[in-house]
Amino acid sequence: MSHTHRDQKKLLARVRRIKGQAEALERALESGGECSAVLQQIAAVRGAVNGLMAQVLEGHVREHLAAADATPQQREQDIEQLMTVLRSYMK
């Protein structure tokens, strides 16, 4: 079973929390909220997305890169895929 499927409830809860934070940010911008409140909302959204990424990344590494039955070629392919995602995320 995939780690994202196994952790689906937790991941969806995180995504819904992010959605709520993004909606709060949108409301703050629409209502002309104070800069400090808007910045705090942006930081909250960023932190929540980083937490989601960390949770999925940890599951991916544990399930795919640490798999005892993976061939060296499969492991190298998994590393390359992961590095592509990380490079994109860090831009």
Swiss-Prot record:
Gene3D superfamilies named among the record's database cross-references: Metal-sensitive repressor, helix protomer
One GO term of the biological process aspect: negative regulation of DNA-templated transcription
The organism's taxonomic lineage, starting at the top: Bacteria, Pseudomonadati, Pseudomonadota, Gammaproteobacteria, Enterobacterales
An annotated Gene Ontology molecular function: metal ion binding
Family label: Belongs to the FrmR/RcnR family.
Keyword Nucleus: no
Keywords: Cytoplasm
Compartments (UniProt record): Cytoplasm
Main location, first listed in the record: cytoplasm
Lineage: superkingdom: Bacteria
Keyword Amino-acid biosynthesis: no
Organism in which the protein naturally occurs: Serratia marcescens
GO cellular component assignments: cytoplasm
This protein's name: Uncharacterized protein in bioA 5'region
